[in-house]
């Protein structure tokens, strides 16, 4: 089937690259892997060959039918469940649980993997990082986005996206995939990122939304000094904020991009005490 531009489809069929993506998940035999946008099933086969039980969510009606019917999934001893639907709307945990035998114990954590359409990368990342978190997330995304996610403090591309994800996960940018590997070729290169949720995230689950809003506000005018950026985020006078920052051990004249994710977590705790 031809890729649909409306769905942002760019098919990847290079077995070597797909194998590296599947290896990055670190699959244990029998582990459930949720695949976002399986397309023609090329990555699906690689996951199956490594012993995964695959739950695949496919929005394209034709591709979903192919995978459910005479497509590649049915030839793998029933270890594929295809869900036709929008991955942004489907309840991932419910569909995974529905494929498991009934048990009085909570279902084990699953992994998430996918070749992600560029136009829905941000909301998919947000959904993937909504608790309860997967064991690991491996996404093929636009290289520019991968660079931003993995960028360290002080980098010109370090920002709210970097802080938000690094506060919850260990981030690894694994390798680049050139545009020419896809059909049709996108205009830019892609990269594979692996996000491993931290055993102890920097911010408690119940404060994740507040943390995200606070960090976005601090970076909304990234050239401002820290005292002004934080003052705008918490609604206080810059002079008052500057004194508080000094008391916390921060230089109020720094730019927000100089702070590590743990520093933003400390500032959020301070702001809650105002």
Locate predicted features.
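Catalytic cores of RNA-modifying enzymes
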Residues: 1-101, 105-217, 246, 257, ...
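C-terminal lobe and adjacent flexible extensions of AdoMet/dcAdoMet transferase-like proteins
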Residues: 215-274
């Amino acid at each position: 089937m031809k890729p649909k531009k409306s769905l942002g489809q760019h098919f990847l069929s290079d077995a070597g690259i797909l194998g590296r993506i599947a290896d990055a998940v670190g699959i244990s035999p029998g582990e459930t892997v949720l695949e976002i946008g399986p397309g023609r099933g090329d990555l699906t086969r690689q996951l199956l060959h490594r012993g995964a039980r695959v739950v695949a969510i496919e929005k394209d009606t034709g591709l979903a039918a192919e995978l459910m019917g005479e497509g590649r999934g049915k030839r793998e001893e029933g270890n594929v469940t295809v869900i036709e639907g929008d991955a942004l709307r489907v309840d991932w945990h419910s569909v995974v649980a529905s494929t498991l035998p009934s048990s009085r114990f909570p279902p084990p954590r699953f992994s998430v993997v996918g070749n992600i359409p560029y136009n829905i990368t941000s909301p998919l990342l947000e959904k993937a990082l909504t608790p309860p978190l997967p064991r690991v997330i491996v996404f093929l995304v636009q290289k520019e986005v991968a660079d931003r996610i993995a960028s360290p403090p002080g980098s010109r591309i370090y920002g709210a996206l970097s802080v938000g994800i690094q506060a919850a996960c260990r981030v690894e940018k694994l390798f680049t995939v050139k545009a020419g590997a896809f059909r049709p070729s996108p205009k830019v290169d892609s990269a594979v990122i692996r996000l491993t949720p931290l055993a102890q995230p920097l911010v408690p689950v119940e404060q994740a939304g507040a943390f995200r809003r606070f960090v976005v506000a601090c970076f909304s005018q990234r050239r401002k000094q820290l005292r002004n950026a934080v003052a705008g985020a918490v609604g206080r006078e810059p002079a008052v904020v500057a004194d508080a920052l000094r008391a916390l051990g921060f230089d109020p004249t720094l730019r927000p991009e100089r702070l590590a994710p743990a520093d933003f977590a400390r500032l959020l705790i301070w702001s809650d005490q105002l």
